[in-house]
UniProtKB/Swiss-Prot annotation:
CDD domains: DMQH. This is NADPH-dependent 3-demethoxyubiquinone 3-hydroxylase, mitochondrial. Catalyzes the hydroxylation of the 5-methoxy-2-methyl-3-(all-trans-polyprenyl)benzoquinone at the C6 position and participates in the biosynthesis of ubiquinone. Catalyzes the reaction through a substrate-mediated reduction pathway, whereby NADH shuttles electrons to 5-methoxy-2-methyl-3-(all-trans-decaprenyl)benzoquinone, which then transfers the electrons to the two Fe(3+) centers. The gene is Coq7. GO terms for biological process: cellular response to oxidative stress; determination of adult lifespan; in utero embryonic development; mitochondrial ATP synthesis coupled electron transport; mitochondrion organization; neural tube formation; neurogenesis; respiratory electron transport chain. Belongs to the COQ7 family. Residues 48-217 are annotated as: 2 X approximate tandem repeats. It comes from Mus musculus (Mouse).
């Protein structure tokens, strides 16, 4: 890893806060615990929770499509198992947000068909640049998602950390796993991708646009 990459990785690492918990602890009982601990459909900030669940569901769906595209190109190469492991975690993330969408009656973004195509195209397109291109995409996307999750964590902590305790735990857990994917990308030569810095900026600009649109539409 280059010196610049090491600094960036350290900076992202400082974003990690909270105590890690295994994903299995959340399970399907999350909804009951949310209600018993004070988070119900009646007493939450519905507008804020709607935005959080809708955009996070869209983001995890897009991440799944990115990894699907990468696996279509690199699935049979030596890096295939690495990508598959990250994809499996993203599948768990999407499953949880599917459950939250139903529990809190949140509609998905109308842009799902676009994220379906765009996510797969991004994953496959960067994978065609080789392992390094795919990992550069992973670094860019996962860093964007981790920062986005941190913004949500700060907002919920400021509003009512006890009321939103279970939702905060889910977001923190997923944030930490996204940062693990980010670090995996760096460990697998992301910075050796052609025009790495430019590619990363372009992908992260796209992520910012996707977040903005998915929160609102």
């Amino acid at each position: 890893m280059s010196a610049a990459g090491a600094i960036a990785a350290a900076s992202v690492g400082r974003l990690r806060t909270g105590v890690r918990r295994p994903f299995s602890e959340y399970g399907r009982g999350l909804i009951i615990r949310c209600h018993s601990s004070g988070m119900t459909l009646d007493n939450i900030n519905r507008a804020a929770v709607d935005r959080i669940i809708r955009v996070d569901h869209a983001g995890e769906y897009g991440a799944n499509r990115i990894y699907a595209g990468q696996m279509a190109v690199l699935g049979r190469t030596s890096v295939g198992p690495v990508i598959q492991k990250m994809w499996d975690q993203e599948k768990n993330h999407l499953k949880k947000f599917n459950e939250l969408m139903i529990a809190f009656r949140v509609r998905p973004t109308v842009l799902m068909p676009l994220w379906n195509v765009a996510g797969f195209a991004l994953g496959a397109g960067t994978a065609l640049l080789g392992k390094e291109g795919a990992m550069a995409c992973t670094v860019a996307v996962e860093e964007s998602i981790a920062n986005h999750y941190n913004n949500q964590i700060r907002m919920l902590m400021e509003e009512d950390p006890e009321k939103y305790e279970e939702l905060l735990q889910v977001i923190k857990q997923f944030r930490d796993e996204e940062l693990e994917h980010h670090d995996t990308g760096l460990d697998h030569d992301a910075e050796l991708a052609p025009a790495y810095a430019l590619l990363k900026r372009i992908i992260q600009a796209g992520c910012s646009a996707a977040i903005y649109l998915s929160e609102r539409f």
